[in-house]
């Protein structure tokens, strides 16, 4: 449970910089909303594709309960130091930026070098057989050292025992610190490139194999990636740029808005560009996606005057774009639900995992 609480705290504190308004409650039939199918209780079927509404009541799923006869996997942690990284030596923001007077889509931010240490938490299922190539799920905003997540491992224990998902290794990667433009976390998660996936492939996963003795599958069909907020945008970016490595994506409150820094004229709207032409104008990629947004998700028009900072609008547009291109996706709109809602995530995570592995 601590991971969920920590994750929500980090994301909300980072997003709630000066002058951030209280998000309004968006109607399920508001502007830009798809035609949702109402689920009166629980979650959509794990095999169902399309757009769904759930809530406003949420409950912890039975998969969170420790069950007799279910073998528990092992959870270990180790740390990685930024001084050893060729990809991300570390930065930190001096102060939150100011809008660029010459570019409504850019923020002027000053940052400085800063070392950091990140914790890698690894779950290995009890069913893993040494020497075999294990399926894999990577999760962003992983827990701190000494506070390993119990939610995802427990859910995986039960789903694997019920043969609803394959026995998979979970690699939970702590971010490099800070949030939004100018921060290490922002640089890792909000940049529109394959760099973060390449960092994980070159530095993190070899370290996981060395520390745990597991062998990880290299096939995209055997790998999923999951995150919340900017971590969700990062998850999709990893799959989009490297579908040979990742083909299954779980996105909670995805930051498919303009939060990229430094400004890149090739993608001037940051992750907003995914649903503003990038996906529509690209060949279909082998990506299967589960995604969510809350009716009280983030809305921040004050950072920049670009109309690209409404999380609900961004996710509605993302779902519509995926549908138009024929992607396999399930989109959940949650009632009475804020950004990265812990209750919502607990209830839906088993079904989300089952959907992307279907």
Label every model-predicted segment:
Residues 5-14:
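Bacterial N-terminal signal peptides
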Residues 16-20:
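Boundary at the C-terminal end of the N-terminal hydrophobic targeting segment
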Residues 21-358:
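Non-catalytic cap/lid and distal C-terminal segments of serine-dependent acyl enzymes
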């Amino acid at each position: 449970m601590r991971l969920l609480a920590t994750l929500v705290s980090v994301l909300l504190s980072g997003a709630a910089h000066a002058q951030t308004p209280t998000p309004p409650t968006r109607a399920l039939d508001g502007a830009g909303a798809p035609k949702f199918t109402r689920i009166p209780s629980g979650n959509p079927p794990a095999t169902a594709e399309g757009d769904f509404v759930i809530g406003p009541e949420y409950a912890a799923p039975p998969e969170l309960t420790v069950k007799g006869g279910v073998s528990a996997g092992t959870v270990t942690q180790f740390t990685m130091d930024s001084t050893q990284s060729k990809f991300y030596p570390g930065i930190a923001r001096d102060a939150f930026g100011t809008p660029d007077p010459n570019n409504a889509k850019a923020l002027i931010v000053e940052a400085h070098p800063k070392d950091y240490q990140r914790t890698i938490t690894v779950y290995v299922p009890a069913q893993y057989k040494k020497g075999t190539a294990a399926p894999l799920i990577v999760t962003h905003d992983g827990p701190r050292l000494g506070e390993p997540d119990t939610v995802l491992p427990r859910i995986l224990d039960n789903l694997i025992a019920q043969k609803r998902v394959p026995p998979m290794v979970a690699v939970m990667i702590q971010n490099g610190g800070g949030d939004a433009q100018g921060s290490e976390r922002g640089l890792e998660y909000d940049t529109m490139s394959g760099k973060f996936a390449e960092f994980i492939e070159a530095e993190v996963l070899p370290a996981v194999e060395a520390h745990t003795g597991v062998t990880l599958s290299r096939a995209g069909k055997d790998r999923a990636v999951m995150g919340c907020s900017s971590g969700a945008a990062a998850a999709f970016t990893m799959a989009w740029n490297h579908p040979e490595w990742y083909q299954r994506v779980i996105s909670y409150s995805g930051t498919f808005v303009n939060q990229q820094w430094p400004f890149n004229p090739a993608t001037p709207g940051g992750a907003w560009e995914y649903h503003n032409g990038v996906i529509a104008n690209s060949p279909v990629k082998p990506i299967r996606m589960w995604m969510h947004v809350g009716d009280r998700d983030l809305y921040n028009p004050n950072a920049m005057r670009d109309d690209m900072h409404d999380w609900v609008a961004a996710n509605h547009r993302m779902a519509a774009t995926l549908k138009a291109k024929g992607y396999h996706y399930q989109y959940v709109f949650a009632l009475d639900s804020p950004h990265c809602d812990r209750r919502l995530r607990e209830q839906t995570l088993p079904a989300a995992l089952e959907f992307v592995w279907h």
